[in-house]
Amino acid sequence: MGFDDDDEDLVVYGTPIEREEDTSARKRRAVAEAGQLRALPAWKQEVRDEEGRRRFHGAFTGGFSAGYYNTVGTKEGWTPQTFTSSRKNRAEMKKQSIYSFLDEEDIKDMGGNALETSQQYDTFGFTATEHARKQASKEQKERPSAIPGPIPDELVVPATTSIGVKLLMKMGWRQGRSIRDAHADSLYESRREARKAFLALSGTKTDGQKIQVDSHKSDKDDGATESFEELHASGNTPVYVLHPKQDLHGLGFDPFKHAPEFKDRKRLQKSARDRNRSDVSMRGSLLISNSGQYAPGFGIGALEELGVEDEDIYASGFAYEQMEVDIEPSKTASDSNYKLEDRKRGVFLAFKIASSSEYKLERFDPPEIPSDFDGRHKFLTPRQDVNNLSDLAPPEVPAPEDTSLRLLIEGCAAMVARCGKHIEDFYKEKSKTNTQFNFLNEGDGCSYYARKLWEYQQKYIDQQKPDTVQSKSSDKLTAENRGKILGERPLDRSTKSSSSSFPAKEAIQLQSNLADNFVKPISLDGLPEYEKPFRNDPAKQARFEQFLKDKYQGGLRPANLIPTSTMSDADRARERLDFEAAAETIEKGKEKKAMDLLSLLGLSGINEQRFVSSTESERSIPARDEKSIYPRREEFEWRPSPILCKRFDIVDPFMGKPFHVQRPRSKMDSLIFMSESTTRTNEVESSSIAPQHTSVAGATETEAKGAATDPEIESSSVQRPVDLYKAIFSDDSDDDMAEPLANQPVDPVKTSEDANMVLNRLVAEDFLESLGKELGLDVPPEKPTPPNVLFRSETPSTANAIGISRNGKAITCQEIKENESALDKEEIANASADVPSDNVEELGLKYEKQEHRAEKSRSRSSHRQTQSGSLDSDSTSDQHRSRERRSRHKIRSGTPGSDSSIEHHRSKKRKSHSKHRTRRSRSPYADSSDSQYSKRKHREKRHHRTRNPDTDSSDHEYEERHKSSSRRSSDKDRSRRRSRHHKR
């Protein structure tokens, strides 16, 4: 179907048929598929270009369909843009509008619906029209025209009026007249007509004719004036004058809205008041104006207000008859009368008040205020309410039969009596859901609950009364009252000198106490001449005094009063440092003087007036040194413990330096925790002074006495418990540590730990033996231990002391040596050469056990042969022990030669004992009776109670190393002893 381009009235339906020669194969395919695409929804259609190619949006799979309905990059949709911004080319702020989000078709559709101002809705009205006309006339004058003369305005600007003007004209308004209410004019006209009718009826015919003529003239005049007013009326809206509100009613309320007759009466009363007011003002005048009178007439309603036009214009002008009427009293005169005088007239006209009355007014005196009355109100607490209301006791009621209910009532009553009424309110709220509490709401058991509540309240009040009496008495108790109660003798006053010196001492002590917390200003007025630090330089002394004033005095500080312009900044800073040092020196000097004065006066007489000494002998106690009262600052060097350095993996900075003895921080520390190093040094010195050939028995006796003199020190240390199973099953390799330092003291805590370790080993053996007997196992008894095996100990304080008591007697080394063999004595001497023997009780225990076993084996021939060489072994052991004391003394002195020899000796001994480490075995020939077991348990308990004094923790590392070496030596001796037994 063809159509012409010029014909706009034709409507085309369908797709036009194109010529085949004008279209390519691809284009024909697109046209053929167009019909199929229309059948698909919009989101399933593929976007293709003009030649039928599918549009590609990106280099990935979803690039063929992008955007809403495939509109990205097309003319119908938005085109993405790259954001570019640099220093030279800044990104522009684009203002967006509704057209930025619309397609071309939408913009075309909205083109005719644009909102624009039109002349039809011109708010200026005729002003805009006149302005347009003037502008057109100006343009016409400037440009030449083919038509001579002015062009009509209708040809230049179309004559249009606004919608407001059209509405006013439809409502009856005419152009050029003001917009006002015409009701006033109609009301005025109606009133004039009413007056004319009234005059016509009252007058004669001649008068009526004249009146008619006059009325016609007046009508003409009124018409002329009306037309004139209409022509020259103002275009402004009238301003309505608001009448002030002078009544007591609400805004907009009209009480006479439905009662017009009352409103008319009120208006007449108001006019009468106004007339009386005007008559009073014009009193004494012969001619009174008639302006207050209004002419009667028809058509005046009750709701209409009087105006100027209501005046009687036909009156004579003067009211002479008003003079004949009595002038009523004014309102001000009536108000001057007393209100009470009006009552004398009575209610009724025939009633008269009597001149004298027999009635007498009876007056009552106010109540008398009691002497103990308190005008301040005190709110009662729940307890006080209970106290006041508990006077009336409820009657006794038997308890309910239900035991659970009785217990519940008694518990609730006790709780309410103790805590207050709010607990009862809580139970009442609970009774709404729980029927068990119905006794609170007049239920079963209510009277029993009231009785129990009263009893508990009385009991609680009786308990509280003694406490209150006691608290009141304790508040008033003073030192004097307490002395009188206890029967103490009153204090005797001391002499006048002591009493006079007491305030001075108190003042000095107060000043010394305040000196630690407050800074006292220095006053240079009372300083002597020799205490002024810069007396040789008066200018500098003046600056120093000014410096002290600025430092210790407040207030405003002026600028530099003393000119110091010649000094540089460095000199000022140096001078200020000098001033600070001088001020500190003066302050210290004053404090020292106060302390010296306090020490001279003493504090012995301060408490003489407050306490009475029990005996006269106590008065001779010397006064204490008061300087020791005040703490002093002390500086000492802190050094970490070696074990601490080892745990933190750092090198001990004080390695090789002697450790100083720590000062006890209190007297209790010095008594209880006595340092062990001092006792050891004393023992070493005493042993070095003594001759070398001193017998071992004598040394043991002296040291046993020394140990007996210090029982408190031994019992004061606390032993650290050692795990039993760890002592049994622990490996010796766990305790291997480096060699101890020669110059470090030994820690007795570690010594006690090692002793506990050995004792726990013995306890473990006994425990396993008893356990085997209970289980019925054949436990082989231990072989008697040869007397040459000793457990190594770490405490070197008692090197040669063996103070173990047995049956009340002291056992010495001489008695033990009688049962030893020569070979065993040599091994004992060799083993004890390097082992410190501080653990005296442990050694004594082992010697006692060895002696007991040796007595049983004296019958053996081998043991008898060994007794022959006991004397030689005694001498060798004594020499070796003396040699050991000398070597230990050299070790403590810290010589380098001794250190090297000790290390060599220990390494040699370690090599010699390494081959004797064998597995532990039990001897089948040991005695295992119950009596020996009980004795051994008793000795172990006694050893467990032993306490060693605690010393400094810096000896920890040395003791750990020493402990490991002692354990190794004891294990070596034990293994060597058992290997000999098996060989036999």
Curated annotation (Swiss-Prot):
Compositional bias per record (Polar residues), positions renumbered to this chain: 679-695
Q: Under the GO molecular function aspect, what terms does this record hold?
A: pre-miRNA binding; primary miRNA binding
> Is this entry keyworded Nucleus?
yes
What sequence ranges are listed for the domain G-patch? 160-202
| Subcellular localization, as worded in the UniProt entry | Nucleus
Q: What is its main location?
A: nucleus
Q: Where is the composition biased (Basic residues)?
A: 882-892, 905-922, 934-946, 975-984
Q: Which SMART domains match?
A: SWAP
- Annotated coiled-coil positions are 814-859
Record's keyword annotation contains Manganese: no
Which parts of the chain are SURP motif repeats? 408-450
Q: Where is the composition biased (Basic and acidic residues)?
A: 131-144, 473-495, 843-858, 947-974
Question: Keywords of this protein's UniProt record, alphabetized?
Answer: Coiled coil, Growth regulation, mRNA processing, Nucleus, RNA-binding, RNA-mediated gene silencing
Q: Which GO terms describe its biological process?
A: miRNA processing; mRNA processing; phloem or xylem histogenesis; siRNA processing
Q: What does the entry list under GO cellular component?
A: nucleus
User: Could you tell me which residues belong to the region Disordered?
Assistant: 131-153, 464-503, 679-717, 775-803, 824-984
Compositional bias per record (Low complexity), positions renumbered to this chain: 697-709
Q: What does this protein do?
A: Functions as a component of microRNA (miRNA) and small interfering RNA (siRNA) biogenesis. May assist Dicer-like (DCL) proteins to efficiently process and/or recruit the precursors of miRNAs and siRNAs.
Query: What is the protein name for this chain?
Result: G patch domain-containing protein TGH homolog
Starting at the broadest rank, the lineage of the source organism is: Eukaryota, Viridiplantae, Streptophyta, Embryophyta, Tracheophyta
